[in-house]
Amino acid sequence: LSDSELITELEKLGTSSHLEGWQVISVNELRKAPSKVHQLPILDPQDPALLLFTSGSTGMPKGVILTHHNILSMTAGTVAMNHFTQQEVTLNWMPLDHVGAIVFLGIMAVDLACHQIHVPMELVLRQPLQWLELIQKHQVSISWSPNFAFSLINQQAEELKHASYNLSSMKFLVNAGEQVSV
């Protein structure tokens, strides 16, 4: 499922990666088509569900195929290990082409049937304290961030001296997505 502008490139990717049965459908075409045209496929747990790309930090970005089993195992394990419930509120501000954003804070939240909030990354990059304000306003309990966001918040030290945030709703904050700097 993709934007119509990317269809040709994604079809080439499927062919070059030898992905059998690879089908790319434009969101616009899906909206126009009668529902009976697009039958839901019968899926095997080992069928590809997502193709995500590495950052390329060690060379060219590489495509990583995640199966339905990979994704659902990760979300079920995370929920069980952390005792997450339907009462959670997740907040994501990272791009959905990152496994943490799409699987951890997207699909897991759907599995939980909990509230999820997604805001553009640029919002937090331009105004880092917006992240804290959103946590407070929506009583967020789960979020994640790479290291650099904590540095951006630290750079707001003067403003933080005059601010007050109630972040007591937070139960789980993951620091991931880049090397830990010391």
Residue ranges and their predicted role:
Residues 4-25, 121-182:
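Conserved adenylate-forming
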Residues 72-89, 96-141, 155-161:
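Conserved AMP-binding/adenylation subdomain of ANL enzymes
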Residues 1, 23-27, 62-65, 115-122:
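Short beta-strand->loop structural element characteristic of the AMP-binding/adenylate-forming
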Residues 24-25, 32-53, 60, 83-89:
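Conserved pre-ATP/AMP-binding loop-to-beta segment of ANL
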Residues 49-73:
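Conserved AMP-binding A3 loop
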Residues 51-53, 63-65, 90-92, 117-118, ...:
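Structured core elements
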Residues 2-4, 47, 68, 146-147:
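Helix N-cap/beta->alpha junction signal
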Residues 46-47, 86-88, 114, 171, ...:
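Surface-exposed loop/turn positions
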